[in-house]
C-alpha cells in the first residue's frame, strides 16, 4: 500500500522545510519537498534530498550496544570493524538497567550534579529537541548545560538592541531593492531564501556580500566585499559614521523609536572610514559607497547570519549591525529591516515541555550550569563535584567541540561513564560505554518551529522505527521508569505534549491547535492577534505597499498582510525602544553603546604574530553538511570535494614554499593537523580556511577543532571558532 506523509525537516537550518515522504509496504521510498509550503515551495537542499540514504543506511545503529574494547580503540577503524570488534549487542532492558544502576551509584557517591547531559541541534523538533530529556535530567538533579556553542552571542547582541529574535520574513526579500548578506552564505545554507532574493534581483535589486570567505553567495553577488575576520563591528561603526555625518539617517524614526542616539553619534564620530579601512581591509571609498547605497536605496535589508558572531567580540559585532536598520528606519518598509533569527516569534510553552521545577524536587534549588563550549576543561578540571557521567544525544562533541585534544582527553577518562544516543557510530561513540539506537524524523512525531520563517508545522511519523531505535522522548521515558521516577509527566503522550506546547500566552499562537496543524500541515503565526495595528501603523503599511505595487497582501503565498514588526517601534526592550544605549549592558559592566576591540587572536590582536601564528583561520562548516551531521554518508561526502583541504591565498602559500596540492601542517599552541593545500582565491591574504569533518575521516585522527579555542564570546558565552590564529608549513614525515 502506498501513502504520502506530511513531515518537516528538523535539522539545524533556518528553513524547516515542508516534506512529503512516500511510504510503500512500510518502507520509505521517496522524499520530496512540499510544493504547498509558502516558503520552502517544493524543493529540498541537496543533503536532505538524499535522506533515504540516511534512513536506510546499513551503518545505522539498530540495537543497544555495550563496549567490549578500550575507549578510543576504534577511532580509526572501519564501520564494520567498529561494530564487530568494539561492541556487543544487548537488549534494551539490559541497557536501561545498566545505565540506571550506574547513575544511581554516581549520585550516591558524588551527587547528582556529577552527571552532565550534552545535547544541541541534532534535531530542532520541539519534543525530541527539549522535552522528556529535560524533565529527566531536571528530576535527576543533574548539572544543567549552557547550550551556547552556536548562536547565543548573536542572539544576545540582537536582543540588546531590539529586544527579541524577530525580523524580516523571507517573503519580503522579494520586494527589497538593496540586500546585504553579512556573514551569511544564503546560497549554501539558507537555500529557500535564495529564490526570493533572485526575484528581487530580477526587478533590479542589488546583492552585496560581506564575508572573509568567497562563499557560493559571494560568487553570485553584484558586489563582494572581503572583510578581515572579527572586524564586523568596526565596519558597522564606519557605516554609521557616514550615515550620521551625511545626514542619511531617518531623524523621525530615530527620535520616536530609539534611545541613545547622541551617545551613538559621539561614538561613531571616532570611526572614520580611513581608520575602518585599516582594520577591515575594505577601502574607505567602498565604505562610503556602501553606507550611501544602503541608506538611500530603499527598501534595504540585511540578512546577517551567525558567522559574524563566532569571534571573540561577536556579540558586539551583532549589536553594531542590528543598529543599522534602526538608524535608517528601514523597519518601516516591506522588504526592509534585518533578519538573523525569527525563532523568538513562536513562543511555545517550553516550561510545560521541560518542567524546570522538577529540579526543586531533586535538589531543592536549581542545579549548577556548565558551559558546553568548554567541555574539555569541564571533563578534565571541573571540581565540586567532577563530572562522572556524560549523557550525549542530539550532538557529536568529539567532532564539533573546540579544543578537540582536551575533549578527547576527557572522554578517555576510565572513570567517566558515557552514554550516547545516536543514529550512527560517530566520533563520540568511539569513547562511549553504552550506545543506544535513535530514530530519524521519519520514525517519530514532532512539533516543528523555524528560525527562518513564520510557519509552524506538525511533523508526522511516516514509518515504524528501524531495528530497535527509539526517539529521545521514548528513550528518556523508559529511563525515567527504570530510575523509579513516579511523576506523571513521564507518562505524557506525544500528542498531549504538543497540545501543551501550544497552550501559550503568546498571542501569535492564538487559534493554532494540533488538530489544525494536522489538517492544514502548516500554519502561519497569528500576527494580527499579536500586533493590532493603530492608525499610524496601518498608514505605514499602506505607504509601503504603494512602494511595492506587486505585493498582494491577500495572496496565498503570504496568507495575510506583510508583518512589519517594528514599523511603529514596539520594541520589547526595557525602554520600549531600539537601544543604541543599553542600561542593561552598563549594569553588566559592558560598553552600553558599541565599540570595536580586535580579537586577541587576530591580525590586529595583542600577540598572535608575536607568538608565531600570523594566519587567521576560518574553521568553516561544509555547505552540504549540517555541522557534523551527514558527514558519514558517502553520497553527501561526494558533494564536498574540499574536505581535508586548507585553502590559502597565493601570497601566503608562496611565502611558505607551498604549492597547490602539497601536504601541509597547520599548527598553534593547542595542536596540529595535516591537510592538503588548496591555493585559490577563496580567502584574502592572511586568512586560511578549512572545513569541519569527523576526526576519523581526517588525516591523523584530528579535525580542525584541534586548533580552535575554548575562549568564550563577549556576550552569550558562545564559541569563538573564527578567532583562531595558526601557522602553516610543508609537512615533513
Regions found by a protein language model. Give the residues of each.
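Extended redox/cofactor-interaction regions of prokaryotic respiratory oxidoreductases
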Residues: 130-198, 203-209, 233-237, 322-431, ...
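Long, contiguous, secondary-structure-rich segments that constitute the structural scaffold
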Residues: 472-518, 557, 628, 633-647, ...
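N-terminal leader/propeptide and maturation segments of large enzyme subunits in energy/redox metabolism
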Residues: 67-70, 85-89, 94, 241, ...
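Short beta-alpha connecting loops at secondary-structure transitions
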Residues: 220-227, 439, 454-466
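N-terminal export/assembly segments and adjacent metallocofactor-ligating motifs
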Residues: 1-246, 270, 283, 393, ...
Amino acid at each position: 500500500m502506498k501513502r504520502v506523509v506530511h513531515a518537516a525537516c528538523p535539522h539545524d537550518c533556518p528553513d524547516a522545510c515542508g516534506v512529503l515522504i512516500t511510504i510503500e509496504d512500510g518502507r520509505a521510498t521517496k522524499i520530496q519537498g512540499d510544493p504547498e509550503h509558502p516558503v520552502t515551495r517544493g524543493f529540498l537542499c541537496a543533503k536532505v534530498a538524499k535522506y533515504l540514504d540516511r534512513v536506510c543506511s546499513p551503518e545505522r545503529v539498530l540495537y543497544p550496544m555495550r563496549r567490549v574494547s578500550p575507549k578510543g580503540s576504534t577511532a580509526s577503524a572501519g564501520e564494520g570493524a567498529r561494530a564487530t570488534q568494539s561492541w556487543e549487542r544487548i537488549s534494551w532492558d539490559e541497557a536501561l538497567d545498566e545505565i540506571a544502576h550506574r547513575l544511581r551509584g554516581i549520585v550516591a557517591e558524588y551527587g547528582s550534579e556529577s552527571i552532565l547531559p550534552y545535547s544541541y541541534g541534532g534535531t530542532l523538533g520541539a519534543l525530541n529537541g527539549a522535552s522528556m530529556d529535560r524533565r529527566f535530567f531536571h528530576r535527576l538533579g543533574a548539572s544543567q548545560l549552557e547550550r551556547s556553542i552556536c548562536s547565543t552571542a548573536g542572539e544576545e547582541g540582537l536582543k540588546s538592541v531590539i529586544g527579541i529574535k524577530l525580523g524580516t520574513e523571507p517573503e519580503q526579500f522579494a520586494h527589497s531593492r538593496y540586500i546585504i548578506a553579512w556573514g551569511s552564505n544564503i546560497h549554501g545554507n539558507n537555500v529557500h531564501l535564495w529564490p526570493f532574493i533572485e526575484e528581487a534581483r530580477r526587478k533590479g535589486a542589488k546583492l552585496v556580500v560581506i564575508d572573509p570567505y568567497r562563499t557560493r553567495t559571494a560568487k553570485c553577488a553584484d558586489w563582494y566585499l572581503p572583510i578581515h575576520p572579527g572586524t564586523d563591528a568596526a565596519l558597522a561603526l564606519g557605516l554609521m559614521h557616514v550615515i550620521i555625518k551625511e545626514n542619511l539617517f531617518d531623524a523621525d524614526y530615530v527620535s520616536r523609536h530609539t534611545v541613545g542616539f547622541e551617545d551613538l553619534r559621539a561614538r561613531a564620530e571616532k570611526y572614520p572610514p580611513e581608520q575602518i579601512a585599516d582594520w577591515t581591509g575594505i577601502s574607505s571609498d567602498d565604505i562610503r559607497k556602501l553606507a550611501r547605497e544602503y541608506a538611500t536605496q530603499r527598501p534595504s535589508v540585511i540578512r546577517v547570519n551567525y558567522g559574524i558572531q563566532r569571534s571573540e567580540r561577536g556579540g558586539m559585532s551583532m549589536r553594531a549591525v542590528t543598529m543599522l536598520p534602526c538608524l535608517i528606519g528601514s523597519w518601516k518598509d516591506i522588504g526592509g529591516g534585518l533578519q538573523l533569527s525569527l525563532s523568538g516569534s513562536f513562543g511555545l510553552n517550553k516550561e510545560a515541555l521541560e518542567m524546570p521545577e522538577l529540579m526543586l524536587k531533586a535538589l531543592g534549588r536549581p542545579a549548577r550550569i556548565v558551559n558546553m563550549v568548554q567541555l574539555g576543561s569541564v571533563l578534565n578540571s571541573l571540581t565540586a563535584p567532577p563530572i562522572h557521567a556524560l549523557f550525549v544525544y542530539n550532538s557529536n562533541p568529539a567532532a564539533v567541540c573546540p579544543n578537540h585534544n582536551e575533549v578527547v582527553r576527557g572522554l578517555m577518562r576510565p572513570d567517566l561513564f558515557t552514554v550516547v544516543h545516536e543514529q550512527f557510530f560517530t566520533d563520540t561513540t568511539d569513547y562511549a560505554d553504552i550506545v543506544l539506537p535513535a530514530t530519524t524524523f521519519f520514525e517519530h512525531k514532532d512539533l516543528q518551529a523555524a528560525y527562518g520563517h513564520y510557519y509552524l508545522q506538525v511533523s508526522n511519523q511516516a514509518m515504524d522505527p528501524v531495528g530497535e531505535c527509539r526517539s529521545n522522548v521514548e528513550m528518556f521515558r523508559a529511563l525515567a521508569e527504570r530510575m523509579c521516577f513516579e511523576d506523571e509527566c513521564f507518562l505524557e503522550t506525544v500528542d498531549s505534549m504538543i497540545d501543551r506546547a501550544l497552550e501559550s500566552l503568546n498571542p501569535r499562537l492564538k487559534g493554532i491547535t494540533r488538530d489544525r496543524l494536522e489538517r492544514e500541515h502548516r500554519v502561519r503565526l497569528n500576527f494580527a492577534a499579536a500586533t493590532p495595528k493603530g492608525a499610524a501603523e496601518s498608514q505605514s503599511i499602506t505607504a509601503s505597499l504603494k512602494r511595492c505595487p506587486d505585493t498582494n497582501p491577500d495572496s496565498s503565498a503570504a496568507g495575510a498582510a506583510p508583518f512589519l514588526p517594528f514599523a511603529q517601534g514596539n520594541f520589547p526592550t526595557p525602554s520600549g525602544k531600539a537601544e543604541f544605549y543599553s542600561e542593561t549592558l552598563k549594569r553588566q559592566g559592558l560598553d552600553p553603546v558599541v565599540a570595536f576591540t580586535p580579537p586577541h587572536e587576530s591580525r590586529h590582536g595583542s600577540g598572535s604574530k608575536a607568538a608565531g601564528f600570523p594566519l587567521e583561520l576560518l574553521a568553516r562548516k561544509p555547505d552540504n553538511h549540517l555541522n557534523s551531521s551527514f558527514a558519514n554518508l558517502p553520497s553527501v561526502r561526494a558533494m564536498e570535494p574540499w574536505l581535508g583541504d586548507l585553502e590559502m591565498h597565493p601570497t601566503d602559500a608562496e611565502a611558505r614554499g607551498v604549492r597547490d596540492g602539497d601536504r601541509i601542517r597547520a599548527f598553534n599552541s593547542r595542536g596540529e593537523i595535516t591537510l592538503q593545500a588548496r591555493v585559490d582565491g577563496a580567502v584574502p591574504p592572511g586568512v586560511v580556511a578549512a572545513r569541519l569533518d569527523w576526526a576519523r575521516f581526517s588525516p591523523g585522527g584530528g579535525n580542525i577543532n584541534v586548533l580552535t579555542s575554548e575562549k568564550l564570546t563577549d556576550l552569550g558565552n558562545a564559541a569563538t571558532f573564527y578567532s583562531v590564529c595558526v601557522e602553516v608549513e610543508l609537512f615533513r614525515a
